[in-house]
Structures are given as structure tokens and as C-alpha cells.
A protein has these predicted regions:
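N-terminal capping segment at the start of a domain
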Residues: 2-28, 129-130, 318, 378-379
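A non-catalytic alpha/beta surface segment that caps or lines the substrate-entry region
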Residues: 22-70, 74-76, 80
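Active-site metal-coordination/substrate-binding segment of hydrolases
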Residues: 67-161
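Short beta-strand segments
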Residues: 76-78, 168-170, 193-196, 216, ...
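Glycine/charged-rich beta-loop-alpha catalytic/anionic-binding loops adjacent to active sites
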Residues: 120-135, 218-222, 342, 374-378
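Acidic/histidine-rich catalytic neighborhood of metal-dependent amide-processing enzymes
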Residues: 121-208, 248-268, 272-282, 288, ...
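Phosphate/diphosphate-binding glycine-rich loops and adjacent basic-rich segments that engage nucleotide
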Residues: 194-227, 231-237
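Metal-dependent amide/peptide-bond hydrolase catalytic core
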Residues: 234-405
Length: 405
């Protein structure tokens, strides 16, 4: 079975994670796909398949006889999807021999356009998989799941020599909980790769340092007709906070290694207001400087409006795994060579986000990220090609071969 065929089967199983949940996994529906995957792994002949109470699926492919002492490597992908644009069933649409031009997405009124996605002409002639324009596709990261499963099938059925291989499928990556209950020792690999990137051939090991920053603003309500020098409007103080941040250091205006402040939510009235940000930077010193900027804003506004008016809470989320991967750059060099062996130009790029591999690297499992062939994740324009997925599978198979040498 080709990887894209598996993807079509997986995306119709709803698995949105829930950022407001306090359970693990954050949504019980993730077990629906986990059980399907565990059964499929067993049917393929993968060993030691297990599904635990936290919705982690593990499995192993024992080394080919004579290769038991080769480096053990693992492959990881996440089962959950973002909850945005996912309030009903996903309907994938297959466009064979795509012409590379603008493409209406069902009857949604949305169109996949070359203007918005300039890479589309390069996909001409491919089998393109899109949504109907009303949901995400879920290729993030069910494409990675499908590619790992297809790799496993190839290793087993084609008797490709390999060392010990570990596989895991995780829940809750999209809400930052993908490694909360990951058992590194049970997984059993010395090194691993997540398949959670974009274009096939991407190799990523430099991610953001990340935190979230929440402001709570307490106002002072007085009748507006008699509020001279008395009222403190919490909404206006909230506006002050945002205006004190650098206006060009937002996601829309940044790229590559540039960091940002991203306002993800706001609410309020005269008496109470809230601002919710995520803060990102690749450079540790610049990241700490961003947090200090936020603390400075809190201090200044409390001096202006009175102590306790503004309360800032900063919560660190993940770190840049580059400092860990720097000690095992064979992971990157072998990934480059695997791409070349598969006929794909390697593309080493910084991750403008994070993956499960970020946390796993700091848990003792160095774990860079590889591309899946997908594009425009987290929205109704998400798309992927069957051919790109085939190449992603070829790359990981070549990677396995390299570690068996």
C-alpha cells in the first residue's frame, strides 16, 4: 500500500486535540486512531506493539540477523490534529494529474491559488490531495504516520537489512503535550527522527525557544459621567501593552531565524482584560531579552496605573534542540545523504515552531525532524502529493540502510 492511501484512511478518523483539557490524552477520540494503528502494526509483523493508557503506540522491528549491534534508530509521528477548522468530519479530495494551477476547494468558496502558494506549479502532473475547503486535511501529522507505517511495511516485506528499529505514534503534539508521558526507555532507540515537517527533503534540527505569556489587567470602573482622573479602563491598558511591543516583530513580518511576539487571544471589559501571547526566538539570549521586555512593560504600567493593575505570567514551553543535536551531527549528515540517495535535494531549514523531537532531545533521545511532503498545515488550504509522500518514504528507508552500514 502506498503512503497516500494510508493517509486517506487515517484522516477520516477525527483526532483533534483539546488545548483546554486537563486529561491525557486531551481528547478520547485519539484512541480511535491509536487502536487502528496498533492493529495495523501487528498485522504488518511489527513486534512488541502496545497502546498505553495515555494513548501512546509503540512498536519495534527487530534487527536483521547479523545487524543486532548496529545503531538503533526510531521514527515518531503524532496522531492528533489541530482543532481549528475541524468541527466536523474531514473529507479528503484526490486530484489526479493536477495541472499546477488554481484549484477550487469543493463548494466552500475557497480556492487554492498560485498567488498564495507559489510552489503549486511544481506539483503539476502529481496526484494532489486537498480538503473540500471546510476543514484541515490532517496531513499534519497523519502523513508522517502513514510514511512510517509504509516504511515499516517495506523493511519487513522486502527484507531490507537494518539494525533495531523503534516506532512510536504520539497524542497531543498540537497542544504541547506530545511527550508528557513518552517512555524513552520503552521506546528503546539511541536516536530518532520525527516525521512532522513540510516539503519532502526538509531536515530540521534548529527550533524556537518558546514560552507563553499571559497578561491579566485589572481596571477600576466608575460611571463614565463622573470618572475624571478615576477610571482605569482595562481594555485600554491592554491596548497599551500591545502597542509597547515592537510592531514588526510578529509572525506576518518575520522569517527564517527571526523571532516574534504573537497575540493569540484577547478578551475584556472595563474591569478585567486578558492578553495571551506566544513568544519565540531561535537565539537563547534574544529569547530571554523578549521575556525581559514583557516584564519591563508590566513594571512600567504598574508604576503608571498602580501596583497590581497588570499581572504577567510567563510559562516556558520548549527549548532549541540544536544544542543537543550539535553533539550528534551524524543525524543530519546521514539525513542529507539519505535524501540524495532517494533523488531528493536535502534542504536544511530552521523550524519556525516546535516538534515532539524538541522535548525528546532534552529527555535523552536526540531527535531532528524530517519533511513529509505536506504544505499549508493548520488550515483549509492544507495539501500534499502522493509522489511527495512516496519520496518521504524513500528517504527514511535510505536512512535505515545508512545506519545498517
Amino acid at each position: 500500500m502506498r503512503a497516500y492511501e494510508r493517509l486517506l484512511n487515517y484522516v477520516v478518523v477525527r483526532t483533534p486535540s483539546d488545548e483546554h483539557s486537563t486529561t491525557s490524552p486531551s481528547s478520547q477520540c485519539q484512541f480511535d486512531l491509536a487502536r487502528i494503528l496498533a492493529d495495523e502494526m501487528t498485522a504488518l509483523g511489527i513486534s512488541d506493539v502496545s497502546l498505553d493508557e495515555f494513548c501512546y503506540v509503540y512498536g519495534k522491528i527487530p534487527a536483521t540477523p547479523g545487524y543486532e549491534n548496529k545503531t538503533s534508530i526510531g521514527f515518531i509521528a503524532h496522531m492528533d490534529t489541530v482543532s481549528d477548522y475541524c468541527d466536523h468530519d474531514i473529507i479528503p479530495v484526490v486530484h489526479k494529474n493536477y495541472d499546477g494551477g488554481d484549484l477550487p476547494l469543493g463548494t466552500s468558496g475557497r480556492t487554492l491559488t498560485v498567488k498564495d502558494f507559489p510552489h503549486l506549479p511544481s506539483l503539476a502532473g502529481c496526484t494532489l490531495i486537498t480538503t473540500d475547503g471546510t476543514t484541515v486535511l490532517g496531513a499534519d501529522d497523519k502523513a508522517g504516520v502513514a510514511e512510517i507505517m509504509t516504511m515499516a511495511e517495506a523493511l519487513i516485506k522486502e527484507n531490507i537489512p537494518h539494525g533495531p528499529i523503534s516506532i512510536a505514534f504520539t497524542p497531543d503534539e498540537e497542544v504541547g503535550g506530545g511527550t508528557d508521558h513518552f517512555k524513552v526507555e520503552k521506546f528503546g532507540a539511541q536516536f530518532a527522527y520525527t516525521l512532522d515537517g513540510d516539503t519532502e527533503g526538509e531536515i530540521q534540527y534548529e527550533n524556537f525557544h518558546a514560552c507563553k505569556a499571559d497578561f491579566e489587567i485589572t481596571g477600576f470602573a466608575v460611571h463614565p459621567g463622573s470618572s475624571k482622573d478615576t477610571m482605569i479602563n482595562a481594555c485600554l491598558v491592554a491596548a497599551e501593552i500591545n502597542n509597547m511591543l515592537p510592531g514588526l516583530e510578529i509572525p506576518r513580518e518575520t522569517e527564517d531565524y527571526e523571532g516574534f511576539y504573537h497575540l493569540t487571544g484577547m478578551s475584556g471589559d472595563v474591569t478585567k482584560a486578558e492578553l495571551h501571547y506566544i513568544v519565540r526566538d531561535h537565539d537563547k539570549n534574544l529569547f530571554e531579552a523578549r521575556k525581559e521586555t514583557l516584564r519591563h512593560i508590566e513594571k512600567n504600567l504598574n508604576e503608571k496605573w498602580g501596583e497590581g493593575t497588570v499581572k504577567l505570567m510567563i510559562t516556558d514551553q520548549y527549548q532549541n534542540m540544536a544544542e543537543i543535536i550539535a553533539g550528534c551531527m551524524h543525524l543530519i549528515e546521514n539525513a542529507k545523504k539519505a535524501c540524495e540517495n532517494a533523488g531528493v535535494a536535502p534542504l536544511v531549514l530552521p523550524i519556525r515552531g516546535g516538534t515532539d523531537g524538541c522535548q525528546l532531545s532534552f529527555m535523552g533521545l536526540p531527535c531532528p525532524n524530517l519533511g513529509t511532503g505536506g504544505h499549508a498545515f493548520h488550515g483549509p488550504y492544507e495539501h500534499i502529493t502522493a509522489e511527495g509522500m512516496d519520496k518521504a518514504v524513500d528517504i527514511v528507508v535510505e536512512l535505515v540502510k545508512l545506519y545498517a552500514e
